[in-house]
Amino acid sequence: MEKKDVFIFSISKLHYFDSLSSNMLYHKYANKIQQLQNNNTMENKISTILMQIENEGIGSFEEVLNNHKLANTMAVSVLVKDRDGKYALVLRTKNLAVGAGMLSVTVTGALDQNDYNCDNPVLACAKRELREELGIFYTICSQIEYIVISKSKLQPIFIINAEIADKWEDIICNFKNAKDYKNEVEEVLIVSLEDMKKLMQKYNMTDATFFHFQDVISRVE
């Protein structure tokens, strides 16, 4: 593309578990699925297979992103700061499929069918997740910085930094009224960059979240 700051990606409709099954089959894990039939729960099966994939390798970023045989659902990682430069981080509840009990950015989530009907599906997803998880209905600036792929999950994740015009202290009381707050959020932490560094040493997090934090910190050092 000759236009500056424009990129194109091809998309097609799929279901949530399509990505998991297609990636297993492509990487020849079908036999391992059969071996796990006696496990008690589907959760145990999936966890075991993901561990095997992580240990045995999944290929380079380019190999995963450019492989048209893989059904890679797209997601967003959104980190928001207020007008005082403070960031909202989230401790996730322990009942989530990804990132359970871990430290996270402000919101995360996968693009859904409604997002794809918007002019910019990625930013539409970011706005929806902010609204559903924390009741934040607007940002004054949202910037897509990178696309990353986790080592343990074949999912392209758009790294997004955003700002709001308010102070967190003025709106944090509204967070608990958000649609998905109870299911996804254990606690919201309002922190400076220095606090963020300390929390990175204290809590577990996904590698995508770690990358996002490190990138933001590196920009001011």
Where do the PLM segments sit?
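Short alpha-helical functional segments enriched in proximate histidine and acidic residues
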Residues: 133
